[in-house]
Amino acid sequence: MLTSAGRCLLLGLMGTVPLLGAAPPAQVIWRGDFETGNLDQWKGAPKSDAVKVVQDIVREGKYACRIDGSNAARRGSLDRIEFQHQPEPPGTAEGTERYFSWSVYLPKKFSDAVHHVGYFETRNSWSQLMSFEAKGEDLKFSTRVPYKLHWTGNGKLTPGRWHDFALHVLWSRDPAKGFVEVWFDGEKVVPLAKTATLRDENVAFFQIGLIRETSDVPESIIIDHVVEATTLKDVTPPPLPKGR
């Protein structure tokens, strides 16, 4: 039978042991929201005069980033002015679970050329793992290990307003373990879907910007609220004020 002193000691020891099965604390891991007033949050920022931090059109806070692109940025068959975010380990390692979000604003409707408005690619082997593609106002989301189209949003990418993307992913080469979920403008458009989300041992990284089939038509995109976190709540931006 424990004495009073023994019970106090036991309770004290129990207080130092974490509860088994307790959920990890919610955490914002990284922000690329330009609230520094520059591009310093991004290790992989484009070096281009077409890129500037702006204050007139923002999703939240004081700053966003505008890209005014043309085929002067042509590389191969694509015009590319893009930001890269490489999650810190274990960000895209086997079994890691993450949420990512970003918001885009188009001053004018995209052309009917293929545009990428957020995608993940492998380092070293340079292979896309999943992508949001746009033609005009039409969107689609697909995974690539192997290719599967998960969502088509015809007429959803309207110009003159902000659009919010959120992605929940468990990184795995095993199609029975990996999964994706997608939200667009606050609505879940892809329920949890099992799929391989890694192709090989190479880490994945995120790219966003003006990435399109090369075209003579100048186009612009404004980017804000790029976030990596451990919960949907932590990547969800505040509600939009009317008119934005």
Regions picked out by a protein language model, each given a short descriptive name:
Residues 23-244:
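Low-complexity, Ser/Thr/Pro/Gly-rich disordered linker/stalk regions
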Residues 1-12:
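Bacterial N-terminal signal peptides that target proteins for export
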Residues 6, 17-20, 133:
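Serine/proline-rich low-complexity intrinsically disordered segments, especially terminal tails, linkers
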Residues 13-27:
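Bacterial Sec-dependent signal peptides at the C-terminal "C-region" and cleavage site
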